């Protein structure tokens, strides 16, 4: 593999990289030898171990030239089963400070459906440089491998060829095969965590959302100096949408932190199987919405008995809305927090004024995208902790299915339409997209 440096005198100078790990030798990128009257810079390195450095020259490493990328895109908002299509476009050579990515898996989340419909506040960039009409490349979460990068002589970054990364900024387009992105928009995965691809692809959005909601409103993380988990009373959390990816992460983190959980789910033919699955993750109690609202079952009394006099429940997590959420709020102790991070029922949330007046209830919203903009360093620490828990088997990823994308653009568009129909009907596992090599 041949690389090229572009030095200040604008002379293109070849550098050769030998990738044999048994015979790696390196020389400083500023080391020169003279052949005739021309300076020649040489460096020997293995791309899989190539690290960034600061130099007065621009340096390329790995794969940096133009390639063809394939992507799932839309030209206008609308029905996800109808507006998505596949698109091929030329990905130009890297610019200064950019990183070349090969996406391994791109995750589909409920918010992505809202993005396609045009009802989500965070939107992908409208690209006018990749086709005859403006297009938006879909995908907010996924895992990618670094195939190359260009150093600009000013920035020293922390990546090397072969590193796996997740997205550190929203709507970067993870449903494509390749991308050139700024290194500042990426988060490296710790190599010593040994995560497999499915774990890595589902790590950047849902587990952090669960972590923050369990930490920021009622401090339940025992590592927090202000954690109420260290007090005399056992802490409890109640949540709806407990079978969602966020809900499952909440269950597992709460179990790890010694916090009890009461989990509400929609009734279905396989409800016993679902309850068993959530309990295997650490759920203390699982109820359907019908069971929760039933007066015949005297559920409120049962929940109070579960919590007991030695416990308290100050946190409720809501991603649904509707009547069930109001009933959840009524069960909270004094100074309770109702945190809303979704509204799948698409109905208004009505809460009795008495909860605010006499019980000092606080109702707030949470969106991870807002939090990450102001907590970059804390996010890095959190991601490492989540990666470690995942590697230790203490935080399991949701059940996933990999959908292979290949063939003509028409074939890919048809497959994506089928995937969106399945998601719309609530069938199947969490979908991960993978572009097959051609």
Locate the predicted segments by residue.
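N-terminal mitochondrial targeting presequence
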Residues: 1-68
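C-terminal hydrophobic helical "lid"/dimerization subdomain
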Residues: 374-438
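Glycine-rich NAD(P) Rossmann-fold beta1-alpha1 loop
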Residues: 207, 241-248, 322
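Helix-to-beta-strand junctions that scaffold the AdoMet/dcAdoMet cofactor pocket
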Residues: 332-333
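NAD(P)H dinucleotide-binding glycine-rich loop of Rossmann-like/cofactor-binding domains
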Residues: 128-143, 155, 164-241
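Adenosine-nucleotide cofactor-binding segment
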Residues: 255-324
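Rossmann-fold dehydrogenase core element
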Residues: 336-339, 351-396
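Glycine-rich beta-strand-centered segment in the early N-terminal region that forms part
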Residues: 90-107, 120-173
